[in-house]
């Protein structure tokens, strides 16, 4: 598997975290205050960590387990998260598998009640070459038996997180530690934990010490837990930043977020264009708003952040609508005629974006990188979400991969309880890694390959790329396969 990674990622860009041996001294269980012993400690109360807590608390088999959820930030109520009519700049594209997970833990109705949920049923992807892009829409979607026609849902991060944490507070078995972080793992020792009955422990920023049969790291791409345990990972920095902001669109939507069907007055289409410096995406939000995620090189990102609002909006419009280069058109025409492909008219000057009224938020940016943890599990420790795998946001799959981790780990914990196993049993945790690592690696490598493909501007690569998009746009089964993956369906099958 690592050989596959090395083939995909440039070795010169690799970042390898030192894997030093974890030595320690450990407190014996007999000296522990029983009130501080938990079945599970979840570090990180963001989207993935809070969903993990809800999944345990809402399951009849596991709801008796004593859980500690540790979150370093101040927690918002649902009411606070919707108090500002303008959406926040951090938004997530949730696939249908994640929505089904939200339904199973009885939090989807709360999220929907905010009226800040926006489904999208079309995706338009193209580049600057002037040939053909890809158009996914409703009639490309195979009925999944759940009457689900939306390709996904764009929702603000804080809306979902506050809804999840509101649900967490309803569970008697879950204790929420707010505005506290993990200060120390108390000299965690793999060998001692593996071969004795001693439980691992964490010391919080208030010096409180907690012990657990299983510690779950869900504290994001800069995981403190992973750093303290010196868990090795492999990856690279893209030397890019994503510039994000919120726009107000010139469209009207009813209370159900339905908009006009006119080409330029529809807020249920996700637009993405691959520029020479990186992709820009317009994500449709509820109530006539949209989120911009513009991935670009460091110098250009700084330039975009320093522009005045009017100039920045002009840059956004030009990036989507500026006429493409036609220098390679002869190559495309030959390929199109040879394979009898029919371009769908997705060149930049034929895209109908919703009218943009203005910029309604500050602009922010965050660095982009790819990262994958070698080991998802240690004795009585498991990593999920961005703590174990980071991907480029261009495909919108980062959080969805984390939610798939939650679903798998929840199932394994349930099986452990049903079978009478220790929930921190190494064999059961290893099963989690065997299931999730191939899935996550597959998506991570696919997205990294796409990034490399779309940021390579040589004539040969550009020609192959556009020929591939044209071919894909004319083969329905292949389009359905890609839609299935984007909705969270697995190509790999496990017994």
Curated annotation (Swiss-Prot):
<dbReference type="GO" id="GO:0071949">
    <property type="term" value="F:FAD binding"/>
</dbReference>
<comment type="similarity">
    <text>Belongs to the UbiH/COQ6 family.</text>
</comment>
<comment type="subunit">
    <text>Component of a multi-subunit COQ enzyme complex.</text>
</comment>
<dbReference type="InterPro" id="IPR000689">
    <property type="entry name" value="UbQ_mOase_COQ6"/>
</dbReference>
<keyword id="KW-0831">Ubiquinone biosynthesis</keyword>
<protein>
    <recommendedName>
        <fullName>Ubiquinone biosynthesis monooxygenase COQ6, mitochondrial</fullName>
        <ecNumber>1.14.15.45</ecNumber>
        <ecNumber>1.14.15.46</ecNumber>
    </recommendedName>
</protein>
<dbReference type="InterPro" id="IPR002938">
    <property type="entry name" value="FAD-bd"/>
</dbReference>
<keyword id="KW-0496">Mitochondrion</keyword>
<keyword id="KW-0285">Flavoprotein</keyword>
<dbReference type="GO" id="GO:0016491">
    <property type="term" value="F:oxidoreductase activity"/>
</dbReference>
<keyword id="KW-0560">Oxidoreductase</keyword>
<dbReference type="GO" id="GO:0106364">
    <property type="term" value="F:4-hydroxy-3-all-trans-polyprenylbenzoate oxygenase activity"/>
</dbReference>
<keyword id="KW-0999">Mitochondrion inner membrane</keyword>
<dbReference type="InterPro" id="IPR010971">
    <property type="entry name" value="UbiH/COQ6"/>
</dbReference>
<comment type="function">
    <text>FAD-dependent monooxygenase required for two non-consecutive steps during ubiquinone biosynthesis. Required for the C5-ring hydroxylation during ubiquinone biosynthesis by catalyzing the hydroxylation of 4-hydroxy-3-(all-trans-polyprenyl)benzoic acid to 3,4-dihydroxy-5-(all-trans-polyprenyl)benzoic acid. Also acts downstream of coq4, for the C1-hydroxylation during ubiquinone biosynthesis by catalyzing the hydroxylation of 2-methoxy-6-(all-trans-polyprenyl)phenol to 2-methoxy-6-(all-trans-polyprenyl)benzene-1,4-diol.</text>
</comment>
<dbReference type="GO" id="GO:0120538">
    <property type="term" value="F:2-methoxy-6-polyprenolphenol 4-hydroxylase activity"/>
</dbReference>
<dbReference type="GO" id="GO:0016712">
    <property type="term" value="F:oxidoreductase activity, acting on paired donors, with incorporation or reduction of molecular oxygen, reduced flavin or flavoprotein as one donor, and incorporation of one atom of oxygen"/>
</dbReference>
<dbReference type="InterPro" id="IPR036188">
    <property type="entry name" value="FAD/NAD-bd_sf"/>
</dbReference>
<dbReference type="InterPro" id="IPR051205">
    <property type="entry name" value="UbiH/COQ6_monooxygenase"/>
</dbReference>
<keyword id="KW-0274">FAD</keyword>
<dbReference type="GO" id="GO:0005739">
    <property type="term" value="C:mitochondrion"/>
</dbReference>
<comment type="pathway">
    <text>Cofactor biosynthesis; ubiquinone biosynthesis.</text>
</comment>
<dbReference type="GO" id="GO:0006744">
    <property type="term" value="P:ubiquinone biosynthetic process"/>
</dbReference>
<dbReference type="GO" id="GO:0031314">
    <property type="term" value="C:extrinsic component of mitochondrial inner membrane"/>
</dbReference>
<dbReference type="Pfam" id="PF01494">
    <property type="entry name" value="FAD_binding_3"/>
</dbReference>
<keyword id="KW-0472">Membrane</keyword>
<keyword id="KW-0503">Monooxygenase</keyword>
